[in-house]
Amino acid sequence: MIVAERVTGVARSFIHQVGISRTAWLRAAAASLLLLALPFVLRLDGRAHADWLQFLGRFHPTLLHLPIGMIVLVPVLEIAGMKRPALREAADFVLRLALALALPTLALGYMLAYGAGDTGTTVSRHMWGAIVLCIGLMLCLLVRPAWAANQQAFIYPGLLVATLIALVWTGHEGGSITHGSD
């Protein structure tokens, strides 16, 4: 019980210090829990499911390049924004748009794997990487305002780097699914 109280206290302090509204925090936590629950609710069982899932899932390769480009663009805009502040505002917009596109990309990828009955270690790693990537984007959006207001120096850049690492890893796993591991 004492550990739970300490963790709760640290979390409240962090949320207050970073300036995250309770509503935004709860929305991000709920969305993260839904993303984390997805593989357990709809297990990739190796059996093909409804054809319409596979049909919609085939749009995953079409859509996925947009959020990838936007996620890579965000740190470029943040760095360039040191000299031109308007670019920092553009970075916020691009980050929001990247998340808005990453979530349906994740859903389409899951529809493709579930509808086709795909399984395997690479598919699983790609799926979990995409989930971590989306959660990382949500966390970046939550803490970015405090960083932009110079209240927190390292949390947002650290999360952004971690999100970029998740992007590279997830993209590599997706490429291995499409083109093979060699």
Task: Walk through the language-model features, giving the residues of each.
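Polytopic transmembrane helical bundles with strong interfacial aromatic enrichment
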Residues: 2-182
